[in-house]
Amino acid sequence: MEGEMKCPIEEIREKPEMRKAQQTYEVQVEVEDTPDTTFSWRKLWAFTGPGFLMSIAYLDPGNIESDLQAGAISYFKLIWVLLVAHIMGLLLQRLAARLGVVSGKHMAEIAFSYYPKIPRLVLWMLVESAIVGSDMQEVIGTAISFYLLSNGVIPLWAGVLITICDTFTFLFLEKYGVRKFEAFFCFLITCMAITFGYEFGVSAPDAGKMFSGMFVPWCNGCDNNMVMQGVAIIGAVIMPHNFYLHSALVKSRRVDRRRAEKVTEANKYFFIESAFALFVSFIINTLVISVFAQGMYGKTNQDIRDTCYNNTHNGMPDFYKVEFPANNDAAQSDIYHAGIFLGCTFGIFALYVWAVGILAAGQSSTMTGTYAGQFAMEGFIQIKLPQWKRILITRSLAILPTLAVVIFSGGIDNISSLNDFLNCLQLIQLPFALIPVLTFVSDRNIMHEYKLASVSKVVSIVISLIILFINFYFLYSWIGSTFGYNAVSIPITIFCAIFYIIFIAYLTYYCLVAMEFISPIQTKWLAEPIYHDFDAPWLEDSENPSTKNTISDDELSMRY
């Protein structure tokens, strides 16, 4: 009957374009359509932007804290670990960018068509929790920077609330265009380079030991604390939500996917840009490690307390001078105490410079976190919210628990230590980004001739296994040292571990099928991906995507 309403499943089945990805960016950056040469600076400039936004995750307050702790605990010995982490991160981020360019969709959109409904929703909730955890780190870093800049006039709880307003303000810049928005991020990265570079200059670290720690892959005389710190560096650098983010950011460039040479060209320039962006990130992180390796390694709380009192010309307010307790424990090394150490040693201006750097790190990463959450919601559950609503949701989820810690913890020391738990949360979530990205880029029905080659597949699998093994080791050690193994913690840990391992195994099944290591099993809960949601317009004689597989109403009902 005319005007009769159809059930959602029937409508989706008749209109597969409803499942096509919505335009992520209303206005895309044009790329000059000229014959590709070996290399073009003009084209590299056109593709420059997404890689720098991606690199923000390598410079967030959680990473900065991990860096300064690495320097304070292990001297210059772990800089090579930072270098290896950046190289592994680059190779994995390349996969995410390649996926976005070739498929025309970002990871969350692909997951919508790839996994059945319930597993997909579980994956979405896990990704969202990783984003909220990362966002909490940015909130903490920003609140501490306001506290330091105001010499305690702006309390922590007020600094936490300010992050709501400033995020709205900065994201408003997007209305002026993608390029201006990206330029603002580059400005914040420049602020970090200048501020942390200033601290490097005044502390004058030993360059020989710094380069030795960078290129000699060993840790002579390292104890368990140093090994754990090396593990923490890798966990802090490779962030789960960053793969989802990067695969979406590359869609800001208008790539003519009807022409294979343009797809190849985009992949090349995005990789070059990402490599340069992560090189800048590595330099900035190295500056931070070196400053605190030179200044805090081997120092006790009493040593730095004495420095604060004996340096009468540092201009530090008296309340800062008692922040380091009068004991012979290893000096406290977190974002807050690091700023006080710099102020006591080099003058209060060094403290302000440090706070500005942390503020830039917090502001830039909190905006990319909001972006990542927006892409995840639009892709996984096909809901597109106005950006102000998305900010309000993300900020609330991050701010409410952070405010609770600030109000009830009784001091800034406890809010800084919350970063350790949040880094652990990121480690738990990492498999839920690594396994899907490996799955999608290995699937010939999505990537076609751009799927992972055999050598790249082996390298990616090895890197992923190394990262996952390191993370599991860190988690096991962290749970043991934090909660201990007793009659209460053991059953809870086992219960959570069972669910965790089962879901990882579920995702791994799809990965092995995509890599063609095993044949698919046709069951309700291991349904085949909906391949007619994907296209390959550069293939002139390709099979009509809509005929790749036929989907029953039962399968559709599981997915939507």
Swiss-Prot record:
This is NRAMP-like transporter smf-3. Induction: Induced by pathogenic bacterium S.aureus. Repressed by high levels of Mn(2+). Repressed by high levels of Al(3+). Induced by low iron levels. Glycans are attached at N310, N414. Keywords: Cell membrane, Cytoplasmic vesicle, Glycoprotein, Ion transport, Iron, Iron transport, Membrane, Transmembrane, Transmembrane helix, Transport. One of its GO terms (cellular component) is plasma membrane. Residues 65-71, 142-152, 204-229, 290-339, 412-420, 480-486 are extracellular. The chain crosses the membrane at residues 44-64, 72-92, 121-141, 153-173, 183-203, 230-250, 269-289, 340-360, 391-411, 421-441, 459-479, 487-507. It comes from Caenorhabditis elegans. Expressed in dopaminergic neurons (at protein level). Expressed in intestine with a weaker expression in the most proximal and distal regions. Weakly expressed in the hyp1-6, hyp7 and hyp8-12 hypodermis and in head and tail neurons. The keyword Nucleus does not apply. GO terms for molecular function: cadmium ion transmembrane transporter activity; iron ion transmembrane transporter activity; manganese ion transmembrane transporter activity; transition metal ion transmembrane transporter activity. Probable divalent metal ion transporter which regulates the uptake of several heavy metals such as Mn(2+), Al(3+) and iron. Plays a role in modulating Al(3+)-induced dopamine (DA) neuron degeneration through the intracellular sequestration of Al(3+).
